Amino acid sequence: MKIGVYPGSFDPVTNGHLDIIERASKIFDKLIVAVLVNPNKTPVFDIDERVELLKETTEHLPNVEVKAFKGLLIDFMKQENAKVIVKGLRAVSDFEYEFQMALLNKKLEPSIETIFMMTNSKYSYLSSSMVKEVARFGGCIEDLVPEKIAKKVMKKLNKKYAEMEENK
């Protein structure tokens, strides 16, 4: 069985992430979306919320699993018996960092491969940070995040939106 792992913070998941997940799910028998617990970051959505948002977003993909992990990605890969890391690239600027990480992972575990997938060009500008910024100021994020989770993301990120929803 070919198992791939697509790791990330996904705070929150964007349409760019979903684009990579859907395309990578066609390559592997099983794709694990690995949600990182990063002690150096303070996410807006806690780990359980991020896992749940991703499960909702990917429920139409039967070979996709969503799991949280902390520590080294290589250790998670071994635990899951996976051999391929999937990394999404928006622009050339993403490549340098991701290339260094791929080399480090290869050094730590020579049997692990990394594949790079370019996101659809219509999402090349998109990041979770940008989604959070737009939502905080009440902007429309419906084209930025999966439709199923847009209201939840807005509710969490925009107090005004949350108050309007509660008063309905």
Curated annotation (Swiss-Prot):
It catalyses: (R)-4'-phosphopantetheine + ATP + H(+) = 3'-dephospho-CoA + diphosphate. GO terms for biological process: coenzyme A biosynthetic process. It is an enzyme of class 2 (transferase). The keyword Nucleotidyltransferase applies. Substrate binds at S9, K41, L73, K87. Its main location: cytoplasm. GO terms for molecular function: ATP binding; pantetheine-phosphate adenylyltransferase activity. HAMAP family: PPAT_bact (MF_00151). Homohexamer. Belongs to the bacterial CoaD family. This is Phosphopantetheine adenylyltransferase. It comes from Caldicellulosiruptor saccharolyticus (strain ATCC 43494 / DSM 8903 / Tp8T 6331). The gene is coaD.
